[in-house]
Amino acid sequence: TLGYVPADAAKISVSLTLEYAWADGSIALLADALGKTEEAQYYREKSLNYRNLFDSRTKYFRGKNSDGSWVSPFSPDASSFYDDILGTELARPYCEGSARHWRWTAIQDTQGLLGLFGSREYFVSELNEFMENSSNDPMALDSAGGFWIGNEHNLHAPYLFNDAKRPDLTQKWVRKTLRDSFGTDSGGLAGNDDGGALSSWYVWSALGLYPAAGTDHYRIGSPNIDEACISLGNGKTLRVIAENQAEENVYVEKVTLNGERLSS
């Protein structure tokens, strides 16, 4: 097989390839848990197929044809939303967004994704620029150049700074998004909630946690609540206490669990 969905055979080929790889990574973890060693290795290798669409020259995931040629012309800001309006196909390989939106989708292999950028510093610089160009527009017609909380392909993006050893930037951008992109009026969500996706992002982020989908790991952000008590469903509870939490106190000094300091 090619190891990717060819652009000349299917629309949204990049998005499909990236999400298939993510799903394969989750299957590998399940196989590990079941003691299925061979199956785990098979799906773990498949989960790296996302790399087949990463263009080392542009540092973006791009559509690739069956013969191995890149889809051209290419613009990282060409959006499928503009295609729908204008009747063009400049962003045909991407679902509900642009190459810039889908640039961060390798949740099953974040360190591998970092490596594709060439350096941690470059990755942080590009991701930070992406966050600086955030859009709160529910229609998303101006969001192709930056982070857009209103659609699911970006939900994890601010938490990737943790993987690049810059938790301060995760904390900065999560708190900014909580403050600027959510409200209590009729326009309180910056997009379609899509089965509770945006609402759950808010709840998790307000607690200072974010689940790494397909794993039992959680990333740490910056809570905007003073205290919360969560029922774990087994007779136990998780009590979250954020000391000195305030709008101006964004950065987390330390995190402890049952009195023991967590290292990451």
Please give the residue ranges for each predicted region.
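A short beta-turn/strand-edge loop motif at beta-sheet boundaries
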Residues: 246-249
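Short, solvent-exposed S/T- and G/P-enriched segments that are highly enriched in secreted/extracellular
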Residues: 262-264
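Active-site core of glycosidic bond-cleaving carbohydrate-active enzymes
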Residues: 1-224, 228-239, 244
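Exposed beta-strand and adjacent loop surfaces of beta-rich binding modules
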Residues: 227, 252-254
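Short strand-turn-strand beta-turns centered on an Asx-Gly dipeptide
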Residues: 233, 254-260
